[in-house]
């Protein structure tokens, strides 16, 4: 091989090797570029997808935000509307209440079809004036009549013209009670009446007979025309029971409305009611719910008005009265005492009322037919002493003696109830820890004689008419002397005699002076042990502001002071 041939071969091989290497590198480069391009594309796709997801999330968030804002706007709009309606409703009520206070309240209109056209019977006219004066004097009755109509008291049932349905219900009684005798002529004449008399004086029939008689006479059995408000559920049920007795077979529908039970059944019954007996709290609830219309009520009764004010129902009473018809309403108020708050309430909502007072009710006094026994003992001996008293007053199942025991608080009542049951006494109880059904059942058992012992707190101290209670035992003295008088008033009712036995301890010594005054006023003996506590009387405290509350006459205008 020549040199030139070898050179050529070398050049050829070098060129071939270089070309292959170059192609290989080129292929690698292309592959690399393709891989990079693919990765780049995947990255772009991934990024684009991620961006799309971000956009979707952002759109979703934005949508949710818009929906949330829309809901908020709707809610704000609804709240604003409700607030406006509530404000308008409140304004209307305030305006109505203001109008009722500023404008005089007119009594029920006297038309020819109404029983308010009262005519004195010939039998009553034939009674001599000396007999009338003797009746008023013997029963310590005073009548304050702004119109000086001088209507005579009805001394017997045959001296008043009532419907046969009412007369038949009264046949089991001998004669009207003093409060009934004096108030009926004014109520049947359509006048506003204030009755101030002790509990158990027949006040329910005093206002119930004219009310039911008027409904029957006018035939107005399609509307709610009579409303009676009472402070407690127990008293409301008692009034209801008495009115049911009057309305039996008369076509008049009576309904009781009170708390502690479902509203639904009460709302259903109200629709066909002519007479409603209610506690203030539940009635205001029904008014606010729009479940009851008082627009046609023309006969309004505030029973135990002083007790309702003591329990803080003044604003509720004003709300209720403002929802009745001022132009046609006849308003009645019955109360055991005549304090300043009750007088102001009467001045605001009654039109020239006739005030009938039985007994000296301006000063707190106890029923003189009640024998009051006060024992000063050690507070740790109460349970032992209670057992002795129950045996003394023959509190066994075979006895007819009904005994009412008062405890101060519901926990004490519950403890004493269990204590008596352990000692084999059959006892019923009414206090705050029991349901309304349990309290009603206990009261029914006591009234029927199924149980001759009833243990109660002060929820039963006012208004309850439990016949034939022979003895009241004050296991723990009440917080006020007024409550003491109301407690012992559960016995000695309707002309009967009774006994009140009180256990007094050193813890109650601040009330010893007031208790001594009550005992002296009723001609009862004052024990020496009670006198040892001294004759001081604790200042009566305001229910909200305490003992240092200054009683200011809010009706007086403020004095304007000018500074030079």
UniProtKB/Swiss-Prot annotation:
It is found in: Nucleus, Nucleolus. SUPFAM superfamilies: P-loop containing nucleoside triphosphate hydrolases (SSF52540). Residues 31-125 are annotated as: Disordered. A motif (DEAD box) lies at residues 303-306. Its EC number is 3.6.4.13. Its main location: nucleus. Residues 184-356 form the Helicase ATP-binding domain. It comes from the Eukaryota. GO terms for molecular function: ATP binding; ATP hydrolysis activity; mRNA binding; RNA helicase activity. GO terms for cellular component: nucleolus; preribosome, large subunit precursor. Gene3D superfamilies: P-loop containing nucleotide triphosphate hydrolases (3.40.50.300). Residues 58-73 have a biased composition (Basic and acidic residues). Residues 385-534 form the Helicase C-terminal domain. ATP binds at residues 197-204. A motif (Q motif) lies at residues 155-181. GO terms for biological process: endonucleolytic cleavage in ITS1 upstream of 5.8S rRNA from tricistronic rRNA transcript (SSU-rRNA, 5.8S rRNA, LSU-rRNA); rRNA processing. Residues 112-125 have a biased composition (Low complexity). It catalyses: ATP + H2O = ADP + phosphate + H(+). Coiled coil: none annotated. The Q motif is unique to and characteristic of the DEAD box family of RNA helicases and controls ATP binding and hydrolysis. ATP-dependent RNA helicase required for 60S ribosomal subunit synthesis. Involved in efficient pre-rRNA processing, predominantly at site A3, which is necessary for the normal formation of 25S and 5.8S rRNAs. Belongs to the DEAD box helicase family. DDX5/DBP2 subfamily. This is ATP-dependent RNA helicase DBP3.
